[in-house]
Amino acid sequence: MPSANPWPSEIRLNPARDVLTVAFDDGARFELRAELLRVESPSAEVRNHGGPKTIVLGKQDVKIAGLEPVGNYAVRISFDDGHDTGLYSWAYLHQLGAEKDRIWAAYLQATSRAAAHK
């Protein structure tokens, strides 16, 4: 179960810019692929302004272009496809890491359904 108030103790981007490692003060450590971070962006455009979530396709080769701290609660992750509006709170990154297998499986299922409807 994710910590109620996780605090990052380390944030590191690998040299290939496709994996973000985040360690937390509760001992959790997650390696988050750029593609997962991009398709699960907490931005309004991906979250569809409160409506059904937008399925983001074609991001297999996306890279992380930059990281920018936002106050004491989040990081803005910019991607090489130009997307830079998601603010990833520490709690969201912790949740994404803790549930990444389930989240990724749901994403793959959604992309399969989207492809079947074309």
Language-model features: locations:
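Motif-centric detector for short Cys/His coordination patterns
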Residues: 1-118
